[in-house]
């Protein structure tokens, strides 16, 4: 965002001028590092008009007030502070954070004033902690209590977006962010923008794209966003192209609804430079299709943990409300919101302020009944873009079809005249409907808002188009006549249904009433009628007091009436539009009398209608596909249905009086005859295209003609000859307990033979030659004949096998399951292409050499401990503890066979492995796992040269009694910064259980071990990986098979990393450096570099700063004697710096430092200068020495002008430079200084310094006012190493310059100044002005801090402290003079 005023989430810091460029600058930078880029520093607090400041503060999300602790809380300050509080009252959502900065005995007075104004969020500077700790506390407070709420759950999504961007080829990359309203698309896009924008030449974030384009126009919007501050107006796109041609640009278009407008926008930007990125957020996937964006990220809802955290923060709920009750309430809210951040936060804010749990529960029920306007508005904007048919389909689904089979819904809606195949896809694209597991689903909020649309159309129940609330339907249908006081019947007129009603779904679970006979008379347009009972334990009681139903609407497509109490449907009912009749447990004897038009009927279900005796009328339904008459015990015959060509399924199970079936349709797929009186099927019954016969038949002749029969289930016994099976593809004889043997089936074309559960089967003569899948689990077979070479799956789970034939020649065998074969003694060998091997619970003592292709090994409960040494193993459970502890160390050692001169080709062929074990089995293992889900390792120089890969150990906590862990895996993200300072990453996903395989019940937690040599940083020069400072960060996330994060169900509790080294095969088991509590944020190149610097010894830090400021690109031979002169060990120091990648030494002996390294060195010097000035200005003084506050009056200034040489020691006063400006007609600028004791002693002395026009070696100094304190008399350096380092650097500047002057031109790399020699006292005179100006350009810092370069040349500007420490004589000890 270019202007923070447009961002409702920015921080405004109010402060005084004195701390703006010291403490406040550090605070601002820390906020930006946390991702809060919009920070406004307001110093107008000194301005009593306060208008501009007030406007800024009112718009801010957080207002930070930095108060000077060393100033008396006078009326002036309190007035200013009151104005800040007034701004906060105008913005009730704004947070106010107070910071009391500076040591003072007036602290108690400030705290009293702040407490009086009701402010509890107060931070104070303390003697026992540094400013950096104070800054960290303030940033944490601001972020976690305000900004963090909006970004809960964003980090894992950022990783996925980043990965999606990185996978795209170089060029103009495009990513679409898609999701339902309120799911966090804009928040995620802003987070991506904040993280990535700094890496682009230009960037823009266009919020509410369609509205912005309409209001401002394309060119004006682009000029405002991409070229802020530009004077010229862009009239043509070509002008913008000329200014941004070939530049890397980041463009974010938020909330795009009109695909055509976005498409035209993007078509004009094919000239952007390679690496440009365009991100579009939309709730309509069709936008991405039209814009040609293939990489689409679907934003998922928050997991349970994140949702609860957001709810509690939004509602400001305290835990003292009762942990159990609070948990139940939060679960209900979270379950209803289903991970939608907008809904969770809105409901949380609506419940905010409710002190009692009962009040919150009541408020929540009201919110469910009438969702808040903000949520309704967000969802209704998508609804308003639909066509009329799409709206009708959406409302039908919202009111009636939640969770129904999508094919069932499509069939009904097609019968209503809609085009659901297309229109449901539109609803899915607009995030209003989802299809999961072949069922139609709506988010609970979406469903309630859809129903609210219906209820909002009219307050008259009888005129609402769709009815689903039982109480309102009962009101319309209930019989309304009764006797009063024994008098004749009195009729009370009630409102009856109208022709506006299109759908009526009545749940009778809690109802008991009489239905009036003419209840449906006026519902002429009723399409969908369903009367059902959702509670199977309740018997509904709905009666017809008159014993009749006068009519049903002729427009019905669905007639679903459970427990229908009458003997037939109304005779005047015309069912020509009916698509489905579903009337289970009815009292029907027949549907109706006579012949009806049933041309639209697709399904009829009359199951368990025990009075049904006649269904002959169904023969007229030529399009009928399903007939379900299960449990119709009085039905005696099934009519010849040969003419029903579309009939696919017939279920006559339980029709005990049916003795025969005369004719079966030719396209029948499923025929259920269990429990019938049918003993045999005639030959003409089995047709060539039958696919499945399900029945316990004693004889099925004619199977040789069934050329398309694919499944034959559960025969009691096999035929004496299997030749009648013809072209059968799948033979399933599962659980045929009486089957004892099978004949030779070598000539059959079977692909699948399932004999599972045939507990009496003890022999097989031969297998089909083309068999692919063989299931022998639970059989009594001890030996099997030669297996066919086409076999792909062999499952003998729990069988009595004792041996297997040699399987080495089975090239296609991929899965071998021998689990539970307790009698299995030997295995001769495995196929070379085997991928999955299961032998859990066997007694094998040795396992043959496993093939290279093996991916999964399940050894649960196996007695074998002599496992092979290679590759990837899963489900490694319940081995002895020693085996588990030793296996990882042994497995890592196996990579020692890789030669030292390895290549990428050899790395790609190197073994990888993984295994898992319950954590309780390795409690005594020395794995050194660290708490948390991330860990950072440091590689020393030798490791980096021979790095092969990493071994990773991850402990995952599973929920109690979690049974299905088949879908669990671990995503590992490896991050590092290359030597150019760019952040790099690689991600690999590891799954410990093969998809679709049943794994043993997991314990509470498991340790997973992975190794993959491809999981390593990319190679730099030679074999040295391109890793900056040797720091590599690993982060671990639990995922499912679709790589979706599972943090809501599983938790990574501990993790660890080991280095695989090619030279020795060792794994750095003891020397690896592990960093705990690593924040899960991207480690930038600067942060990696700073970590390396902070870990250096003090003298190595000094050496680095020397090189950063003076000796970049210099020869080592030139630098060494100069550095040695100040007692620094050059040889070891340079090696240390090179090992952590702070410098590098080229092949010709030059010290090379990249730009980011030099930048960090300058910033360190800059920061130390700030600390120096801060320390000088805030040194503790006796309170009695502080002059009392006097009335303001203008003092007369004492003016004195002197001229001194530029190298003179000066007046020995301590000055602080606060400005500089060019003087008209003068060659030299004028510097402005004030006494460093202005704020501690109230000293008003100032001076102006300018070089002489006639003699540039002379300085003209003008003194204004007198000092009110004694002149300092002694030299002193800061007690801490930071200041001493800064001082030593400053001192060396002059020395280095002098060395250059004495250098012989003929010997450029041989300095003539020996390390022990003492340069002349006036050596600084020889420092050329051009060198001085060049150095000033290279080391430019802010003008309002002490300039350490000037300190070196003008000692009179240096502070002369009172005491002395070991650093105070540093320069004198090494004979440095100025």
UniProtKB/Swiss-Prot annotation:
Keyword Cytoplasm tagged: yes
NB-ARC domain boundaries: 170-421
Compartments where found: Nucleus; Cytoplasm
GO BP, sorted A to Z: defense response; signal transduction
Coiled coil: none
The keyword Transcription is assigned to this record: yes
Gene3D superfamilies: Helical domain of apoptotic protease-activating factors, P-loop containing nucleotide triphosphate hydrolases, Ribonuclease Inhibitor, Toll/interleukin-1 receptor homology (TIR) domain, WRKY domain
Domain TIR: residue ranges: 5-146
Entry binding sites for ATP: 179-186
Extent of the LRR repeats: 498-522, 535-553, 554-575, 577-598, 621-646, 665-688, 742-766, 768-793, 831-854
GO cellular component assignments: cytoplasm; nucleus
Disulfide-bonded cysteines: none
Region feature (Disordered): 1300-1321
Any Pfam family: WRKY
Domain of life: Eukaryota
Subunit comment: Interacts with PopP2, a R.solanacearum type III effector.
Additional comment: Ecotypes susceptible to C.higginsianum or R.solanacearum, such as cv. Columbia, contain a protein with a premature stop codon while the longer allele found in cv. Nd-1, cv. Wassilewskija or cv. RLD confers resistance.
Name by which UniProt lists this protein: Disease resistance protein RRS1
Organism whose genome encodes this protein: Arabidopsis thaliana
Gene this chain is encoded by: RRS1
């Amino acid at each position: 965002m270019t202007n923070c005023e447009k961002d409702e989430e920015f921080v405004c810091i109010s402060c005084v001028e004195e701390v703006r460029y010291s403490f406040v600058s550090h605070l601002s930078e820390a906020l930006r590092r946390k991702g809060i880029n919009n920070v406004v520093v307001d110093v107008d607090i000194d301005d009593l008009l306060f208008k501009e400041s007030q406007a800024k503060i009112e718009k801010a999300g957080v207002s930070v007030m930095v108060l000077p602790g060393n100033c008396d809380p006078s009326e002036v300050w309190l007035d200013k502070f009151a104005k800040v509080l007034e701004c906060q009252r105008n913005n009730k959502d704004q947070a106010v954070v107070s910071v009391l900065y500076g040591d003072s005995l007036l602290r108690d007075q400030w705290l009293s004033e702040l407490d009086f104004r009701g402010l509890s969020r107060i931070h104070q500077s303390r003697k026992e902690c540094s400013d950096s700790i104070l800054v960290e506390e303030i940033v944490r407070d601001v972020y976690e209590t305000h900004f963090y709420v909006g970004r809960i759950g964003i980090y894992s999504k950022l990783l996925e977006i980043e990965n999606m961007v990185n996978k795209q080829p170089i060029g103009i990359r495009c990513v679409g962010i898609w999701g339902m309203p309120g799911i966090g698309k804009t928040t995620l896009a802003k987070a991506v923008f904040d993280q990535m924008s700094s890496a682009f030449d230009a960037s823009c974030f266009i919020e509410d794209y369609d509205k912005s384009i309409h209001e401002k126009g394309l060119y004006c919007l682009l000029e405002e966003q991409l070229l802020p501050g530009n004077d010229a107006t862009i009239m043509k796109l070509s002008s913008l192209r000329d200014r941004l041609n070939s530049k890397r640009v980041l463009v974010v278009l938020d909330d795009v609804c009109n695909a055509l407008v976005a498409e035209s926008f993007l078509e004009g930007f094919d000239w952007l430079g390679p690496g440009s990125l365009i991100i579009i957020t939309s709730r309509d996937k069709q936008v991405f299709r039209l814009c040609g964006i293939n990489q689409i990220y679907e934003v998922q809802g928050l997991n349970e943990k994140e949702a609860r955290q957001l709810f509690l923060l939004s509602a400001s709920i305290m835990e003292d409300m009762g942990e159990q009750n609070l948990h139940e309430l939060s679960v209900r809210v979270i379950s209803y919101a289903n991970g939608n951040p907008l809904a969770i936060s809105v409901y949380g804010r609506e419940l905010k302020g409710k002190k009692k749990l009962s009040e919150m529960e009541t408020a929540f029920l009201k919110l469910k009944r009438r969702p808040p306007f903000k949520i309704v508005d967000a969802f209704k904007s998508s609804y308003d873009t639909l066509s009329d048919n799409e709206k009708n389909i959406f409302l039908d689904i919202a009111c009636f079809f939640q969770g129904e089979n999508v094919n069932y819904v499509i069939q009904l809606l097609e019968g209503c005249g809609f085009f659901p195949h297309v229109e449901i896809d539109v609803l899915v694209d607009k995030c209003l409907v989802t299809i999961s597991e072949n069922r139609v689903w709506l988010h609970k909020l979406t469903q309630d808002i859809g129903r609210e649309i219906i209820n909002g159309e009219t307050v008259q129940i009888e005129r609402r188009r769709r009815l689903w609330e039982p109480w309102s339907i009962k009101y319309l249908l209930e019989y309304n006549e009764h006797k009063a006081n024994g008098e004749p019947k009195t009729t009370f007129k009630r409102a009856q249904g109208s022709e506006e009603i299109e759908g009526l779904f009545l749940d009778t679970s809690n109802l008991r009433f009489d239905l009036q006979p003419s209840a449906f008379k006026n519902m002429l347009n009723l399409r969908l009628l369903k009367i059902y009972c959702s509670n199977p334990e309740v018997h509904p009681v709905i009666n017809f007091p008159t014993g009749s139903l006068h009519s049903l609407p002729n427009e019905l497509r669905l007639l679903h009436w459970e427990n229908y109490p009458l003997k037939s449907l109304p005779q005047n009912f015309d069912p020509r539009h009916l698509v489905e009749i579903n009337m289970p447990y009815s009292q029907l004897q027949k549907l109706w009398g006579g012949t009806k038009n049933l041309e639209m009927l697709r399904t009829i279900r009359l199951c368990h209608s025990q009075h049904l005796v006649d269904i002959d009328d169904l023969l007229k339904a030529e399009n009928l596909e399903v007939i379900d008459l299960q449990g119709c015990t009085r039905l005696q015959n099934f009519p010849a249905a040969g003419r029903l060509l579309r009939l696919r399924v017939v279920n006559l199970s339980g029709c005990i009086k049916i003795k025969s079936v005369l004719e079966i349709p030719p396209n029948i797929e499923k025929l259920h005859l269990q429990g019938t009186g049918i003993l045999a099927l005639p030959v003409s019954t089995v047709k060539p295209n039958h696919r499945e016969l399900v029945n316990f038949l004693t004889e099925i002749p004619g199977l040789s003609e069934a050329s398309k029969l694919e499944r034959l289930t559960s025969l009691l016994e096999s035929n004496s000859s299997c030749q009648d099976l013809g072209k059968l593809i799948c033979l399933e004889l599962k659980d045929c307990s009486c089957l004892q043997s099978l004949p030779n089936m070598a000539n059959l074309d079977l692909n699948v033979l399932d004999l599972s559960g045939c507990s009496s089967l003890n022999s097989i003569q031969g297998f089909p030659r083309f068999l692919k899948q063989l299931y022998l689990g639970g059989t009594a077979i001890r030996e099997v004949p030669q297996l066919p070479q086409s076999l792909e799956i062999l499952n003998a789970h729990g069988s009595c096998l004792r041996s297997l034939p040699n399987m080495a020649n089975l090239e296609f065998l991929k899965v071998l399951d021998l689990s539970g074969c307790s009698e299995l003694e030997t295995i001769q060998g495995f196929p070379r292409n085997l991928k999955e091997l299961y032998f859990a619970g066997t007694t094998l003592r040795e396992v043959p050499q496993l093939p290279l292709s093996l991916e999964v090994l399940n050894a649960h409960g196996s007695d074998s401990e002599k496992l092979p040494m290679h590759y990837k193993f899963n489900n490694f459970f319940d081995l002895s503890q020693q085996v588990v502890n030793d296996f990882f160390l042994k497995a890592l050692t196996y990579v020692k066979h890789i030669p030292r001169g390895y290549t990428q080709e050899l790395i790609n062929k190197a073994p990888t492995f993984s295994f898992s074990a319950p954590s309780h089995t390795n409690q005594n293992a020395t794995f050194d796992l660290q708490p948390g889900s991330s860990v950072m390792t440091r590689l020393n120089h030798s490791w980096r040269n021979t790095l092969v890969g990493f071994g990773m150990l991850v402990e995952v906590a599973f929920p109690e009694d979690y049974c299905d862990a088949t879908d669990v895996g671990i995503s590992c993200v490896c991050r590092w910064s290359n030597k150019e300072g760019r952040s790099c990453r690689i991600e690999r996903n590891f799954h410990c259980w093969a998809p679709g395989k049943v794994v043993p019940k997991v314990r509470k937690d498991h340790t997973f071990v992975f190794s993959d040599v491809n999981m390593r940083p990319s190679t730099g020069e030679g074999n040295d990986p391109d890793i900056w400072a040797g720091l590599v960060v690993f982060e671990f996330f639990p995922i499912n098979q679709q790589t979706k994060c599972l943090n809501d169900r599983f938790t990574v509790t501990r993790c660890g990393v080991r280095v695989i080294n090619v030279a020795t095969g060792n794994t750095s088991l003891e020397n690896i450096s592990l960093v705990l509590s690593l924040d899960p944020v991207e480690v930038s190149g600067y942060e990696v570099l700073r970590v390396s610097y902070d870990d250096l010894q003090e003298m190595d830090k000094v050496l680095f700063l020397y090189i950063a400021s003076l000796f970049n690109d210099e020869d080592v031979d030139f630098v060494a004697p100069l550095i040695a002169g100040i007692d620094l060990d050059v040889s070891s120091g340079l090696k240390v710096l090179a090992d952590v990648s702070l410098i590098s030494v080229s092949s010709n002996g030059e010290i090379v430092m990249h730009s980011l390294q030099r930048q960090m060195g300058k910033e360190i010097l800059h920061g130390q200068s700030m600390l120096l000035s801060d320390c000088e200005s805030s040194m503790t003084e006796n309170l009695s020495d502080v002059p009392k506050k006097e009335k303001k009056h203008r003092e007369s200034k004492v003016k004195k002008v002197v001229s001194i040489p530029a190298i003179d020691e000066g007046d020995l006063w301590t000055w602080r430079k606060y400005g500089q400006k060019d003087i008209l007609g003068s060659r030299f600028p004028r510097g402005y200084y004030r006494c460093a004791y202005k704020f501690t002693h109230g000293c008003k002395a100032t001076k102006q310094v300018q070089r002489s026009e006639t003699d540039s070696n002379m300085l003209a100094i003008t003194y204004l006012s007198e000092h009110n304190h004694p002149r300092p008399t002694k030299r002193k350096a800061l007690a801490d190493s930071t200041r001493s380092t800064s001082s030593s650097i400053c001192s060396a500047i002059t020395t280095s310059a002098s060395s250059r002057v004495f250098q012989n031109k003929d010997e450029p790399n041989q300095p003539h100044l020996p390390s022990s020699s003492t340069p002349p006292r006036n050596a600084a005179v020889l420092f050329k002005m051009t060198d001085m100006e060049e150095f000033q350009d290279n080391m430019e810092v802010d003008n309002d801090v002490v300039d350490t370069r000037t300190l070196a040349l003008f000692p009179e500007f240096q502070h002369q402290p009172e005491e002395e420490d070991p650093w105070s004589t540093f320069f004198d000890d090494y004979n440095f003079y100025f």
